[in-house]
Amino acid sequence: MESSTTRQGHGEPARTPRGTGPRVRDPLALLTAEFDGVHDVWRSAAGTVCVAGPEPARAVLGNRDGAVAETADFYRTRHGDFGPRAAQIRIGRAGRALIRRHLDARRPELPALVAEHLVPSSVWPDAGNLLVFRHLRDVLLHRGASPQLHATIGQIVHRAVLAGARRRHSPPSRLLFRRRALSVLHAEIRARQREFGSFHEPRDLLDVVVRESEPGSDPKDLAEVYLSFLFAAVGSVGFALGWTVHLLGTHPDRLAMEPSWTVREALRLWPVAWLFARTPSHVQRLGGTEVGPRDRLAVCTYLVHRHPGHWERPDEFVPERWAAPVPDGAYLPFGHGPHTCAGATVTMRLLEDLVGIITRDRWLSVTHDGAGPQVGPALAPPRFTAVLSDRTGCPGRR
């Protein structure tokens, strides 16, 4: 797992820079302050081994030679990784196919959806999450499901998926809601397990999870896998849309650029999945730093995407950089290796469609208070208001 990079200083053990400012609690700000732009791997002041270089990041996430304990981020449950691996693959493949069919069928509805939810103004990042939820709600849960189940899924989105939503409720309230919501989900999963085989095609993603898992799987584990779909589809995709809208609104000279460029550049600057935790399987050297099973590795794709040795103008919004080949090895918005996000392709397509519709025939302006990202397991945009207005006589993007 030794980094193969030969830039000056990379072969030396990393040193944690000593700062004189106040103690930083924000983990993103802490990692950014510690990264010196030279050492790709270092041991942070908190003891975590941080990875910011593309090569060691790919080595860790790709798990070359079994260097780290096998971990599936999407399928991680309270009881460990959901499995077996064959079931993960089946669920991912079937879920991706179902979402793709849904997007193909509902693509013509997107312009009206944008007009209804975002025009003339909208408050983000919630607007992005709720727009995606509205567009995907039938694939998340089929229309024939019980009103109680539909209400529960909607409450989960509002109380747990939206940025900062959990902070708006007290710990006892969150615990009580979690118990009630999981009770409803567990009951539905048990019912679908009993009726397994009575339907030929999956009606929604919950069917996919039940059908493609191993017989006798614990409903509690299946509920967590289903919630991973919900959080990824509504949370991650919504936040990625929010970052793209925020950047375009604050860089109006970039509005006419190709949606594929702006989406990719937004995910470079602000990768929603920004931090991946891993545990070394044995003592080894990673980028000049000795690590072992007692260490916690933190692969920070935010820093990989802004690495000054691999990107020109790394901290600037430059969508046009995607008009030419880019250093793919330093671009990991969906992770890397065997557990790369299975829905990356369909996610990018939906984002590009939405950004194209938002910007094609409208002016976009954004007002915000200058706050930074909302940092958590996902990297969410700050709160801002987006205003869309028609371009009089605009011929549209060609």
Sequence positions of predicted segments:
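Central I-helix of cytochrome P450 enzymes
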Residues: 136, 205-266, 351
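Cytochrome P450 heme-binding "Cys pocket" and the immediately downstream C-terminal segment
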Residues: 346-379
